[in-house]
């Protein structure tokens, strides 16, 4: 078993500061980068990607519901097409920024309510897993151990990393 220290970063918003991001990027192996829907913007994504590259940290997309007012923590009921679009849009903006630095997005981990809902709901978990497979089947999908997300990911034979919190 390999341990990968992972952290959510680039989450500058009215709810959070990103002042500690550079220090955290000295100790983590991989970063889940906010993609602008719950927090962050192109500037913060660019800064995190730049430091990730410097420190050899894997870059991951951290997509969420478009809910900056509640930091992506409000549960929203969206159609499968809407879920697919929000995942693709957020992944693509981060991937485009990463490419400008000669990097790629290596993994994806949903944020907040989107993640929490998918942990409990196999239908939503399946929509997310299928969407990820459709836009980049090589991404590592970070999922909570024993969740509906893990179950759905296995149906699609996805590369997964099971997370635990310490």
Give a label for each model feature:
Residues 68-107:
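Glycine/small-residue-rich loop that forms an oxyanion/phosphate-binding "nest" at active or ligand-binding sites
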Residues 3-7, 31-33, 59-63, 106-110, ...:
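Hydrophobic faces of well-ordered beta-strands that scaffold small-molecule active sites
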Residues 13-45:
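A short alpha/beta connector and helix-capping loop motif
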Residues 21, 31-38, 69-84, 118-122, ...:
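Glycine-rich tight-turn/loop motif centered on a GG-T
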Residues 26-30, 53-56, 131-138, 154-161:
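Glycine-enriched alpha-helix->loop->beta-strand junction motifs that scaffold or abut catalytic
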Residues 100-148:
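Hydrophobic, well-structured mid-protein blocks that either form specific transmembrane helices
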Residues 22-26, 47-60, 99-101:
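Acidic (Asp/Glu)-rich catalytic clusters
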Residues 146-166:
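Active-site rim beta-loop-alpha module in soluble metabolic enzymes
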């Amino acid at each position: 078993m390999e341990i990968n220290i992972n952290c959510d970063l680039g989450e500058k918003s009215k709810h959070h500061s990103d002042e500690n991001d550079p220090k955290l990027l000295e100790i983590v192996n991989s970063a889940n980068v906010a993609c602008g829907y719950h927090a962050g913007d192109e500037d913060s994504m660019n800064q995190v990607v730049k430091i990730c590259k410097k420190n050899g940290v894997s870059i991951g997309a951290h997509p969420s519901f478009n809910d900056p007012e509640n930091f992506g923590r409000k549960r929203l009921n969206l159609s499968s097409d809407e879920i697919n679009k929000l995942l693709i849009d957020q992944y693509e903006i981060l991937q485009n920024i990463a490419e400008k630095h000669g990097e790629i997005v290596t993994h994806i981990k949903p944020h907040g309510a989107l993640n929490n809902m998918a942990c409990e709901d196999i239908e939503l978990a399946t929509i997310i897993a299928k969407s990820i497979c459709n836009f980049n089947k090589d991404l590592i999908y970070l999922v909570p151990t024993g969740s509906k997300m893990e179950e759905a990911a296995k149906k699609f034979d996805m590369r997964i990393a099971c997370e635990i919190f310490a």
